[in-house]
Amino acid sequence: DALERLELPVNLAKGVARIELLGNREVYMDRHCGVLAYTTENIDVNGGTVVVRFYGRELRLLVMTGQELRITGVIERIELVE
């Protein structure tokens, strides 16, 4: 496979969203495809192949660009919905 020959991580090469959780207070996500729903208790993000649902308290979309977003608050649960 061409991706293996280039030695690139498959998820990076195929544009899959990447999620980084910093404790239970902050989430960094890149390669997203937009926010679908936003309240202080629930944020749904289009991850390309899945919808990523963040549940918690006092959730806040701190930063959002075309490629990256950062969510703060008390993150209680993350769900991937196909």
Predicted segments with their positions:
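N-terminal intrinsically disordered, cationic/polar leader segments
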Residues: 1-82
